[in-house]
Amino acid sequence: MEADFVIIGSGSAGSAMAYRLSEDGRYSVIVIEYGVPDVGPLIQMPAALSFPMNMETYDWGFSSEPEPHIRGRSLVTPRGKVLGGSSSINGMVYVRGHACDFDHWSQSGARGWAYADVLPYFKRMENSQGGQEGWRGTNGPLYVQRGKRDNPLFHAFVEAGHQAGFEVTDDYNGEKQEGFGPMEQTIHNGRRWSAANAYLKPALKRPNVKLVKGFARKIVLEGKRAVGVEIEAGRTFSTIRARREVIIAASSINSPKLLMLSGIGPAAHLKEHGIDLVADRPGVGQNLQDHLEVYIQQECTQPITLYSKLNLFSKARIGVEWLLFKTGDGATNHFESAAFVRSKAGVEYPDIQYHFLPVAIRYDGKAAAQSHGFQAHVGPMRSKSRGSVTLRSANPREKPVIKFNYMSHEDDWADFRHCVRLTREIFGQAAFDPYRGAEIQPGAHVQTDDEIDNFIREHVESAFHPCGTCKMGAVDDPMAVVDPECRVIGVEGLRVADSSIFPRITNGNLNGPSIMVGEKASGHILGRTPLARSNQEPWINPRWQVSDR
């Protein structure tokens, strides 16, 4: 079996590339996916988002090694093992990232990936419902909507931010990210709008696109040229050959693992596992980054939260309405208000993100408070801690060693202390007076730096945004894995295009920029002239040098 292009992974970037590479009918595409079909309400019903990320049917089941700076806790790292990849098990929050994120990419060696370069691709991929005119796309495959915000707590959160002196923004994906405002969702007609729904399924209707179920074991190389992929399906091993190129889009965990199993990575590490060296790229598996967050929870004195919807009878009613009509509480992820703010004067653009939720519960649906409550997920966006993904053995079936080194930089502790105290300030505003009860978490007794630090060690969680392990950069950067056209340095016919190529993590959730990578990489693969650069200037707070708000 062979095709012009072979893509490993049907996730956010992989699905976008399958769609774009096959679009004009000139080239054939094979997408290799080990995961299951994305069928059923547990995947497609937005309110069921906590289920697929906890199910081995849909998730690769990765966890970090015990993290020494948070009391040896091992944090789960859900990655989608399903059509659509992690876009089929994520929280459906859509964030492009800040313009300065991409300018930093370009300045650090990923030339051609500045905001002016990537904005046209964001516009091309979006079908924005209600976004800022002129800044958003309206004809793309990816539907993006805002929630209805029927619950008054969503408005209280935005008003509280305004009362605290922060900006308000109607579209954080438009000209102005900074501020409090509505959150955007990849939901369409009451269903999760994953990369599979947006890109892969339309592509699979074309005669030149084929989906192959199989476990990718390694890249097949002839000398220093990639010519195919060895896969395992059942107990059968076979090679799918690529006439033009192999593109890895297997996630920030599996993409570096696959490179190393194929002889591309740190020479000493490959030798340790008896793997023949093809290209010594010491950056493979390094530069691992993530977003961490804590939940600041408050009791609600009015019975208006989702707490009353957590019993089995209510869940059944919500499920039936969604199955019949795709409406009601099942048709939203319930993340409908958000904020991006700056932590202090001298910070040019936001470095803190908020998700607001009208219930007190963990992101994975566990440990719900036994009362009406609301919460903010809050965390710094630009941690200085860096981790790694390395091989446990040369057996492709073994999970890799994942070390995030969470909270290993002292600045991370100061940033999180500020996040906790700032959230308390926001919840203390007059807008919450009609609703505010006692603080559930951390609890009023947690006040000093040491007490907050202990709370963080026990309760900090991953936001599930791993990236950076196949860093994009200049060819002469020894830690770069791919060049600015996503080509693996030192190997021909092989590219990586997913969140693993991010030089630095972006502001917010990663599904949006990962899809953008797939869109832009497709143009490089096809040898097309990039879309015309944008001349739109994003809003930067004129007071950034003297104030945090």
Swiss-Prot record:
Known cofactor(s): FAD
Catalytic residues as annotated in Swiss-Prot or TrEMBL: 465
Family matches, as SUPFAM superfamilies: FAD-linked reductases, C-terminal domain, FAD/NAD(P)-binding domain
Keyword match Ribonucleoprotein: no
Pathway(s) served: Amine and polyamine biosynthesis; betaine biosynthesis via choline pathway; betaine aldehyde from choline (cytochrome c reductase route): step 1/1
Functional note: Involved in the biosynthesis of the osmoprotectant glycine betaine. Catalyzes the oxidation of choline to betaine aldehyde and betaine aldehyde to glycine betaine at the same rate.
Record's protein name: Oxygen-dependent choline dehydrogenase
Gene (UniProt): betA
